[in-house]
């Protein structure tokens, strides 16, 4: 049975390596739009550069799909990304909205995740300020 392009796209993310990034060429549109809390790019080369940058800056990034929902031209994914940075394993939970055209090619991919709790809180100065503000503003049970 032939895989749909969205299935190929998801499989590529779940098995992504620096050498497999080039495989996006066959399943994304030339003018794909991508955004996440740190990036907003348009175009296939810029899209692939996001992932080359990821492999350059974190160790052993892995994606795991936790849940998904599809309709005719859109898929929503709940995912977990794990990687090593800041001297330990990091885990980020997020959601993606992926849109595709009539032929199944991906036209946009928008990631939504909590960058404050996922990344910034682990930075010494920002983490200290955030934890201090939680003591002030969080309701105690």
Provide a role label for each language-model segment.
Residues 1-141:
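C-terminal and inter-domain tail/linker signature
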């Amino acid at each position: 049975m032939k895989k749909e392009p969205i299935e190929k796209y998801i499989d590529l993310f779940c098995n992504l390596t620096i050498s497999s990034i080039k495989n996006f060429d066959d399943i994304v549109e030339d003018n794909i739009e991508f955004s996440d809390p740190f990036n907003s790019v348009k175009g296939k080369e810029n899209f692939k550069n996001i992932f080359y940058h990821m492999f350059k800056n974190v160790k052993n990034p892995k994606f795991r799909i936790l849940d998904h929902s599809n309709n005719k031209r859109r898929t929503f994914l709940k995912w977990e990304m794990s990687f090593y940075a800041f001297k330990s394993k990091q885990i980020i939970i997020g959601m993606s909205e992926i849109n595709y055209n009539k032929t199944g090619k991906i036209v946009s991919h928008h990631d939504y995740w909590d960058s404050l709790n996922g990344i910034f809180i682990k930075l010494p100065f920002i983490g200290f300020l955030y934890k201090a503000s939680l003591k002030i503003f969080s309701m105690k049970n």
